[in-house]
């Protein structure tokens, strides 16, 4: 088994005294690829905020086994958190992922940024403002920013909200390569995508239910989402999983 990166035990968290997450325990290991699913308002974003130290737990513990890991977390936010009108170029966005590296010279950051631009296939748009990017281009730009600092843990919050479907398979190929060295936590409402790509799954709906492996079925989903699921086919069910077709 890989080494433990993050250990969360008996976590209670929320806002203004209101509990959003209740008695959460979770372990994340090196090279893990954990998919987090759950209904709106179930606490997925709150859990990520606790891991990122943006909010403090009401009780419980969040322990990084290596203190350096806490300073080496890559984060890719939801698309609605991005101000596309902000006057910044693709290359500048990517280099901003090194802002905490005070010891690095500007020239070194520029060189590292160029390497990441090539790795993500962004050479043709490096000098474009982010407001001119397609969804897929913006997604790759923000992924580059998130991994430029070689994080031990990469957190992706609803990455499918960016995706140009033509580049979806390429995006997950990039994640597969990144996962060889980096643990990944991916939050998504797209349960089909989760099942197809992750190694383990956690359903967050106030409490957390962990499922080792990605071979979940509709009964497990119905129990933890508290609504019907359809595994095969198209329909008007609130959440549905479709096999590849």
Regions found by a protein language model. Name each.
Residues 108-125:
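Conserved ABC ATPase "signature" region
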Residues 57-73:
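Conserved ABC transporter NBD signature motif
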Residues 154-158:
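Catalytic Walker B motif of ABC-type/P-loop ATPase nucleotide-binding domains
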Residues 6-8, 21:
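Conserved structural motif at the start of ABC-family nucleotide-binding domains
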Residues 129-133, 137:
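Conserved ABC ATPase signature
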Residues 52:
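Helix-to-loop junction immediately C-terminal to a conserved catalytic motif
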Residues 216-245:
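ABC ATPase nucleotide-binding domains
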């Amino acid at each position: 088994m890989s080494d433990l990166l993050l250990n969360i035990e008996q976590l209670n968290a929320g806002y203004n005294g209101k509990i959003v997450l209740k008695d959460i325990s979770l372990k994340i290991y090196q090279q893990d690829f954990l998919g987090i699913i759950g209904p709106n308002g179930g606490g997925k974003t709150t859990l990520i905020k606790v891991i990122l130290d943006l909010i403090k737990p009401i009780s419980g513990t969040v322990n990084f086994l290596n203190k350096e890991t806490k300073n080496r977390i890559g984060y890719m936010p939801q698309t609605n958190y991005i101000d596309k009108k902000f006057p910044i170029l693709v290359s500048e966005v990517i280099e901003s992922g090194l802002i905490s590296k005070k010891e690095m010279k500007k020239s070194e950051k520029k060189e590292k940024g160029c390497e990441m631009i090539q790795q993500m296939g962004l050479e043709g748009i490096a000098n474009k403002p982010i407001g001119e990017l397609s969804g897929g281009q913006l997604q790759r730009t923000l992924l580059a920013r998130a991994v430029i600092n070689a994080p031990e843990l990469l957190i992706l919050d609803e990455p499918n909200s960016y995706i140009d479907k033509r580049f979806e398979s390429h995006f997950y190929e990039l994640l597969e390569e990144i996962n060889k060295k980096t643990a990944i936590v991916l939050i998504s409402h797209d349960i089909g995508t989760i099942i197809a790509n992750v190694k383990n799954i956690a359903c967050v709906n106030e409490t957390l239910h962990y499922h080792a492996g990605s071979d979940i079925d509709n009964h497990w989903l119905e129990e933890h989402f508290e609504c019907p699921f359809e595994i095969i086919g198209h329909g008007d069910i609130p959440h549905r999983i479709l096999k590849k077709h």
